[in-house]
């Protein structure tokens, strides 16, 4: 998982650096012009994936974990994943220095207040993907499916709102996958080394989860 994420980010950054982005602008136009009825839903999704939204999600997850007498380790992992993905995204933004699409693409529709910082990669996507990957193995299958769908929709919403290109979302997803994968590896080591008495308090990742990636 971590290696795949790193590769996805590297390819995205290489495409941006070499200027092979004509497809990116074309796809941006398609996703930026979807029906206006989706504005409230996609705007809400992006707000839920903001730093404040992530804190709220982690807090709610903590309540969920405590209510079921489970370990807080997965919640801690989610918080670490969010912080690491956010920092790495802003470092990459400073290096790439790509203008936002609404600043340079003729006819681009901006459906929110102008965003701060540069475009590549999408920090919203990076944080969301990192947290979802870190927490999905510890969630019931239904909630895990919802979480994965949420991460995908957040990425799409950033393009629809006019603040990111699709390539920015792919780069952010790569960072999120890399960070989330490292967190899962660390969790695997911690759970494997946990004393027998503590094993019952920390849920093992499901066998069909990406924890072994």
Placement of each model-derived feature along the sequence:
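Interfacial segments of alpha-helical transmembrane regions
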Residues: 1-2, 60-88
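N-terminal transmembrane-helix/juxtamembrane module of multi-pass inner/ER membrane proteins
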Residues: 1-54, 93-114, 210-213
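Transmembrane helix-loop junctions in multipass membrane proteins, especially transporters and channels
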Residues: 18-20, 69-73, 94-102, 163-167, ...
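Hydrophobic alpha-helical transmembrane segments
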Residues: 46-68
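Aromatic-anchored segments of alpha-helical transmembrane domains
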Residues: 9-11, 83-90, 151-163
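Membrane-embedded catalytic cores of phosphoryl/pyrophosphoryl-handling enzymes
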Residues: 106-213
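Hydrophobic, lipid-facing residues on alpha-helical transmembrane segments of integral membrane proteins
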Residues: 79-91, 174, 178, 182
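Membrane-helix interface segments
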Residues: 37-38, 70-75, 139-145
């Amino acid at each position: 998982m971590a290696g795949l994420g790193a590769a996805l980010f590297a390819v995205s950054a290489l495409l941006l650096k070499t200027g092979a982005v004509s497809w990116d602008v074309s796809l941006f136009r398609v996703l930026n012009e979807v029906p206006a009825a989706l504005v409230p839903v996609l705007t809400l999704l992006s707000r839920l994936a903001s730093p404040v939204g992530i804190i709220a999600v982690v807090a709610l997850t903590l309540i969920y974990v405590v209510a079921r007498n489970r370990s807080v380790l997965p919640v801690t992992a989610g918080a670490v994943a969010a912080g690491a993905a956010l920092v790495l995204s802003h470092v990459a933004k400073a290096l790439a220095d790509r203008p936002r699409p609404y600043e340079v693409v003729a006819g681009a529709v901006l459906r929110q207040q102008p965003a701060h910082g540069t475009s590549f990669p999408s920090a919203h996507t990076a944080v969301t993907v990192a947290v979802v990957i870190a927490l999905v193995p510890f969630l019931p299958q239904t909630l895990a499916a919802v979480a994965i769908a949420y991460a995908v929709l957040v990425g799409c919403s950033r393009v629809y709102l006019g603040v990111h290109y699709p390539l920015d979302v792919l780069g952010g997803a790569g960072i999120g996958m890399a960070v989330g994968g490292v967190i899962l590896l660390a969790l695997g080591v911690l759970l494997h080394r946990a004393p027998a008495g503590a094993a019952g308090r920390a849920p093992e990742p499901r066998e069909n989860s990406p924890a072994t990636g």
